[in-house]
Amino acid sequence: MDRRAFLFQSFAATAQALASARHTLAGTSDGPAKHRFPNILMKTHENRQVRFYDDLVKGKHIVLNFMYASCPDSCPLQTANLALVQKILGPRVGQDIFMYSVTLDPTHDTPDVLKEYSARFGIQPGWEFLTGAPDDIDLLRRKVGFVKRDPVLDRDKSQHIGMVLYGNESLDRWAACPALSRAANIAEYVMWMEARTTKPAVGAVEQGTASRPA
């Protein structure tokens, strides 16, 4: 599948999950990028205080998903799969690609809880697990489009953990895919968000030799 076709299908397939974020994330006509992402105060699993937009998103190439430590099945599978993505992307994670997992249970998921959770999966530097005030987390979730129209479903944390949002803030380029997609495919899709003249080779992604844009 070529890049243009994939990007189209990616947005089509995630219409429900990203419905409220489409015009927010899709172009430059809505104003500066900083107004599209809440600049909420958060803490990382290393207990470092950060601002979501200023410190984590502005000018960066990111991968973002939602999770919670007490999730019994889906979250561990998704985290393990994304750990494979991190391995494939290699040293680029933390240098020019940044991975973020935001808890949907901030009351329980303190930095210490998230640190223990990340250690279970051998998470390497460049991937931050984030918590914050419940209202702020809810605002972030909604702003990036993880919303259900049915208010009962929207209150169910398990309804918001199946997708990965990825993009390049400096280019205002965004897409999403299922968190349990093949890890090599996710890594390839992430690299499609770059300003490059050639598409990343699937074989290179498979072998974990992802390179910077040509």
Explain the meaning of each model-derived region.
Residues 96-109, 126-135:
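Thiol-based oxidoreductase modules, predominantly thioredoxin-like and allied folds used
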